Regions:
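Hydrophobic alpha-helix immediately C-terminal to the catalytic Tyr-X-X-X-Lys motif of short-chain
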Residues: 169, 173, 177, 207, ...
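Short-chain dehydrogenase/reductase
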Residues: 112, 160-171, 202-209, 233, ...
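Residues in well-ordered alpha-helical elements
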Residues: 80-83, 90, 102, 109, ...
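Short glycine/proline- and charge-enriched loop/turn segments
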Residues: 149-158, 206, 293-296, 309
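N-terminal Rossmann-like NAD(P)+-binding domain of SDR-like oxidoreductases, especially those catalyzing
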Residues: 1-193, 243, 247, 318, ...
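Glutamine-centric residue-chemistry signal
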Residues: 94-95, 198, 229
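C-terminal substrate-binding subdomain of Rossmann-fold SDR/epimerase-dehydratase oxidoreductases
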Residues: 9-10, 16, 70, 215-339
C-alpha cells in the first residue's frame, strides 16, 4: 500500500507543512517527503530540534530535492508564525511539542503552553487556511492508569503526568474542530518511537538513544526500576508511513479518529537492554561485559504498554515492517556511522 501511495504522490506532488521539522520525527518526515518529490514547509523554533538534523536530511536527499524545502524559524505559540507556515499548504503533519513526561512534571506551564496553546494556534491556522487535513502527533501516555493490555483507542484511564493531559486535550480539540468546522483531523498515538536522529543528550533524552550512547562510550546505562517495565517500541519508519497514510487516506470512515501507532509487541527494559548490548557489541566487543545500574522508578511513567493496532491496520492500511530488533539494528548502524 505504501508503494502505491508513493507512486501516486510522485505523479501528483502536494505541499506539506511539518511542524517540529528539525526534531526527531519531524526530520524523518521531511526526508521521506522530499525523497517522494513533495514540496515541504517546515516550522521549528529550534528549542528541542536542531539545525544539524536539517543538514543531515539535506545530505541524504541531495541538492535538487532539498530545493523543494522552505524552512521558517518560528514558534507554534505565536499564531502569526502558524498562519505564515500554513499558506497554500495541502496537509499538516503537526509534530511540534515538548514531548517529555519528566519535563512536564518539572515544568507543567511550559509544557501546556507548547502542547495546548501551540496546538490550538496550529489547528486554528490550518482551519483558516482551508487545509485539506490535519494529522497530529498523539501519545500512548493518554492511556494513563488504564490496566487493560493491549491498549485500545476507546478505553482510557486517568492521566499520570501533565504531558499526558496535554496530549489528551489535543484529541479533544481535534474532535471539536472536526465536528464544528469540518476540518479533517487524524491523531496518531505514538508508542515509544525510536530511530535515527533521536537525541541521546540532555536530561530528558529517551531511553534508547541514551543507552546506545552509553554503550558506545562504555558507560553503564541506568534502568529505572526493576527492568520489568515494558513498552511497545516503534521504529521511526513505521511512524513515518503512518503519517503519510493518515494524511492521504480516501477512506471516509478513517477520518476524525485517533490511532495507535506501534509494532504491536511488548518488550521489557531488561530485554531491550540485552538487544542493544548485543547489537552494539558487533561494533564494539567491549560492550558485552557492561552491566546495568538499577535506579528508582520514574515518576509519571506507566508500568506496561502494548498497543492494539487493528484499527490503524483496518482503516489506514498501516502495516509496520520493522520490529524492535530490526529497528534497533538500523538505529545502531546509523549512530555508529555518525560517530
Amino acid at each position: 500500500m505504501i508503494d502505491t501511495l508513493k507512486d501516486r504522490l510522485k505523479a501528483k506532488p502536494k505541499k506539506w507543512l511539518v511542524t517540529g521539522v528539525a526534531g526527531f520525527i519531524g526530520s524523518n518526515l521531511l526526508e521521506e517527503l522530499l525523497q517522494w518529490d513533495q514540496a515541504v514547509v517546515g516550522l521549528d523554533n529550534l528549542s528541542t530540534g536542531y539545525r544539524y538534523n536539517l543538514e543531515d536530511v539535506k545530505k541524504e536527499v541531495g541538492h535538487k530535492k532539498w530545493s523543494r524545502f522552505t524552512f521558517y524559524e518560528g514558534d507554534i505559540r505565536n499564531l502569526t508564525d502558524c498562519r505564515k507556515a500554513c499558506e497554500e499548504v495541502d496537509y499538516v503533519l503537526h509534530q511540534a511539542a515538548l514531548a517529555s513526561v519528566p519535563r512536564s512534571i518539572e515544568d507543567p506551564i511550559a509544557t501546556s503552553q507548547s502542547n495546548i496553546d501551540g496546538f490550538l494556534n496550529m489547528i486554528v491556522a490550518a482551519r483558516d487556511a482551508g487545509m485539506k487535513r490535519f494529522v497530529y502527533a498523539g501519545s500512548s501516555a493518554t492511556y494513563g492508569d488504564h490496566p487493560e493490555l493491549p491498549k485500545r483507542e476507546d478505553k482510557m484511564g486517568h492521566p499520570l503526568s501533565p504531558y499526558a493531559v496535554t496530549k489528551y486535550v489535543n484529541e479533544l480539540y481535534a474532535d471539536v474542530f472536526a465536528r464544528t468546522y469540518g476540518l479533517e483531523c487524524i491523531g496518531l498515538r505514538y508508542f515509544n518511537v525510536f530511530g535515527r536522529r533521536q537525541d541521546p543528550n540532555g536530561a530528558y533524552a529517551a531511553v534508547i538513544p541514551r543507552w546506545i550512547d552509553s554503550f558506545l562510550n562504555l558507560v553503564e546505562p541506568t534502568i529505572h526500576g526493576d527492568g520489568e517495565t515494558s513498552r511497545d517500541f516503534c521504529y521511526i519508519t513505521n511512524a513515518v508511513e503512518a503519517n503519510l497514510l493518515a494524511a492521504t487516506t480516501d477512506n471516509a470512515e478513517a477520518l476524525n479518529k485517533v490511532y495507535n501507532i506501534a509494532y504491536g509487541s511488548r518488550t521489557t527494559l531488561n530485554q531491550l537492554y540485552q538487544i542493544i548490548r548485543e547489537e552494539v557489541s558487533q561494533y564494539k566487543p567491549e560492550a558485552k561485559t557492561i552491566e546495568p545500574i538499577y535506579g528508582l522508578f520514574r515518576q509519571g511513567d506507566i508500568r506496561h504498554s502494548l498497543a492494539d493496532i487493528s484499527r490503524a491496520k483496518e482503516l489506514l492500511g498501516y502495516d509496520p515492517k520493522f520490529d524492535v530488533k530490526q529497528g534497533m539494528a538500523e538505529s545502531i548502524k546509523w549512530y555508529i556511522n555518525k560517530t
